[in-house]
Amino acid sequence: MARRKNSRYSGIGGQAVLEGIMMKNSEKYAVAVRKPNGEISVELENYQGVLHGSKIKEIPFIRGIFNFIDSMILGMRVLNYSASFYEEEDNAGSAGADRTGGSGEKFVNALVTVAAIVMAVGIFVVLPYFLASLLKGYVRNESLMAIIEGAIRIFIFILYVWGISAMKDIKRLYRYHGAEHKCINCVEKGRPLTLHNVMRSSRLHRRCGTSFLFFVFFVSIILFFFIRVDSVAQKVILRILLMPVVAGISYEIIRLAGRSDNILVLILSVPGMLIQRMTTKEPDESMAEVAIAAVEAVFDWRQYLYDNFGYEVDESWMDGNESSYADQENDADGASDWLEDETADEEPQEWETEDPGEDAEEI
């Protein structure tokens, strides 16, 4: 029998936070955090995003801009929430009383988000331009200058990722990032969401935000080709003004990458997947447990497996009796071939070319 594709789009996405994971499914999101006492705290909330219900968010290339804004806002919110568990003891009481934050905290979060965007634009947009400009005396071709600028931008990003990876908290963040990907890959490959299955799933995923950032750099090289003005100020301003356009195009590419086996898309996905080797690390089982808790809070993976892979989960499989699942898998129509050895699992996943709809989550 010919081997069939065995991955399906699940609609879930998320991010790593301090000692935890945020998972989002449509408008619901859950933050699971391993508290200092070893317990797992799970907070379930709704996030409708900017311009909720507006038809503007359904327009291709425009929707990516608002998706990026939503990701920044929600990302800052859940990072602050997870950090509240590790504040100094004299602040623990007030943090526990209201971890969602009042209007004052929301205002501060908004300022921090804006400051982060400004800093990112300065480091990854403006700085590469001025560094590339130092070579103008040696390179006269504007197109080549745009390529050099893009290469410098990618180099700065890789240097940044590598540099912060030396920090203890970031090392653990990267491991939780790997746990997040493993959970999503586990269910999208049709495996029951058990600790064993999660640990043997891939830590790389094509819809990852790291891959999105690479597409941003790649698209910016192409668009910046067309900036043909003499004024330095105009060149910088045009680059900044084009960034929403770059984000919108990059979002559509990563949506396509998450559901297409087109050879060009696969090739374009490779650099982002390689960079993910730096931004994700192998988690331990305690981290995977946190990721599983976050997924289960927002996603009915048992129903998902039944709808997409055609089998019901036997609770005996959840007790570690994997042979029962193996026997069932041999007989069930549509069950995934999850018993193959994928412990290396650094290869890009197989994907169905079905349309995930407008709620596609970047992870």
Please identify what each model-predicted range represents.
Residues A2-G13, V17, I21-M23, G93, ...:
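Polar-ligand-bearing catalytic/cofactor-coordination segments
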Residues M1-D90:
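Divalent-cation
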Residues V50-S54, Y81-K106, N330-D333:
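Cytosolic regulatory modules rich in charged/polar residues
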Residues F107-G122, S201-F226:
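Transmembrane alpha-helical segments and their cytosolic interface motifs
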Residues K28, I59-Y81, E149-Y174, A247-R259:
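Hydrophobic alpha-helical membrane-embedded segments
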Residues V219, L223-D230, I237-A293:
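Membrane-interacting alpha-helical segments
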Residues Y81, F85, M119-N141, V216-A247, ...:
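Juxtamembrane "helix exit" motif at the C-terminal ends of alpha-helical transmembrane segments
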Residues E89-G137, N141-M167:
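Hydrophobic alpha-helical segments characteristic of transmembrane helices
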